[in-house]
């Protein structure tokens, strides 16, 4: 197991390079509504986030649109959202459940965007109002939300984040879509809502050395397994 810390003092960003091979995991990247961009994009960016987090909202408002325009919409990066509610219960968990329940009806991203845009109105009545405005089946949504049907999956996401060493939100992982992290091209962990330029620098570096051959996309859940026993912690 190897690791190298690189400090970028100008932007106060710490990058942790993890050089373990990927281990087997479950799930499929193609059946998860929390993915934006092409499945064939050479780079995958995973965000661990909380709908109540101010810095997460800052990323959503200021940085994600630029990443979307330059990398996601152009087929260079696929973007994966993972839940990291900072508390075990409360608004953050409720919002994550609401987004998942909307996703069950094929409207994850509209709800995701609405929740980050309406952070002063994160309550059960508002969630159900958003679902109605989106044309969702209100009975199905209400049942899903009231029964907290996605709690286990939400907290599995949070466990992934802590395995990477994240102790706050947002946190980001950059990995190769095909093959996952290797010693030659490790995963890059980026803690915090760093400027767009920091994301662009790392993405461009990975794109410049991206292999031309294509294989099966790496499952984001599988890639996170490489950090489960890592001694490297991000602060």
Where are these regions (language model features)?
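Bacterial N-terminal signal peptides that target proteins for export
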Residues: 1-10
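Bacterial N-terminal signal peptides
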Residues: 9-20
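Signal peptide processing junction and immediate N-terminal pro/mature segment
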Residues: 22-24
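A short beta-strand-turn-helix
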Residues: 26-43, 71
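Structural alpha/beta surface segment adjacent to cysteine/selenocysteine redox centers
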Residues: 41, 49-132, 137, 205-210, ...
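Soluble periplasmic/extracytoplasmic beta-strand elements of cell-envelope proteins
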Residues: 44-47, 78-81, 171-173, 189
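Acidic/histidine-rich, surface-exposed loop or edge segments in extracytoplasmic proteins
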Residues: 46-51, 184
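C-terminal cap of thioredoxin/glutaredoxin-like
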Residues: 62, 129-235
């Amino acid at each position: 197991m190897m690791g190298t810390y690189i400090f970028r003092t100008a932007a106060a960003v710490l990058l942790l390079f993890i050089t373990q091979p990927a281990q087997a995991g479950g799930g499929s990247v193609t059946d998860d509504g929390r993915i934006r961009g092409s499945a064939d994009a050479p780079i995958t960016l995973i965000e661990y986030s909380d709908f109540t987090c101010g810095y997460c909202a800052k990323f959503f408002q200021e940085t994600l649109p630029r990443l979307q325009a330059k990398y996601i919409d152009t087929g260079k990066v696929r973007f994966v959202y993972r839940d990291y509610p900072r508390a075990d219960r409360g608004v953050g968990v409720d919002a994550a459940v609401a987004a998942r329940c909307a996703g069950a009806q094929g409207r994850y991203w509209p709800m995701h965007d609405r929740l980050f845009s309406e952070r002063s109105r994160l309550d059960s009545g508002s969630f159900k109002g958003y679902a109605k405005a989106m044309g969702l089946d209100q009975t199905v949504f209400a049942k899903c939300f009231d029964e907290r049907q996605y709690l286990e999956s939400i907290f599995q996401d949070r466990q992934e984040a802590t395995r990477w060493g994240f102790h706050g939100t947002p946190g980001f992982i950059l990995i190769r879509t095909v093959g996952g992290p290797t010693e030659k091209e490790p995963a890059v962990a980026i803690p915090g809502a760093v400027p767009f330029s920091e994301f662009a620098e790392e993405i461009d570096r990975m794109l410049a050395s991206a292999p031309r051959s294509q294989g099966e996309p790496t499952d984001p859940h599988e890639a996170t397994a490489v950090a489960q026993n890592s001694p490297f912690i991000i602060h």
